[in-house]
């Protein structure tokens, strides 16, 4: 059962560059807070997978995560702004939610990024979501804080 959980964790955001962060290749997993929710608990939100990592980053790690996220943004559904929200400052992302191309029929994939500047580090949260929820649904459910 434990191996199955590890396997699901590794494949939820398979094929995405930010998977390097989730796998602990950018910063040690012991330095991150991670949560993975799957199944019926997400049914009210029309989601199947919600995978989140939160980490404290220095300038170098922030730049790496930002670059990986930007690479994944190239896989969004279209070039118009209807499938994403993006807020950036000084060339770095501070908030983003992006709908990616569908991985399976009638299943949407989303990546989210939030970076809060602290006194001597950056508080970064990355989220991967998968399910039938539309971007409009997610905007209602997870209002930007």
Predicted regions, residues:
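Bacterial Sec-dependent N-terminal signal peptides
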Residues: 1-20
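Generic recognition of cysteine residues
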Residues: 9, 31, 112-115
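Early exported N-terminus immediately downstream of N-terminal targeting peptides
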Residues: 15-66
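Terminal interaction module
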Residues: 18-22, 77, 143
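Long, charged/polar, surface-exposed segments that mediate recognition or autoinhibition
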Residues: 54-89
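Generic alpha-helical propensity signal that fires on short helical segments
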Residues: 65, 142-145
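Surface-exposed, polar helix/loop patches in the mature regions of secreted/periplasmic/lumenal proteins
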Residues: 75-142
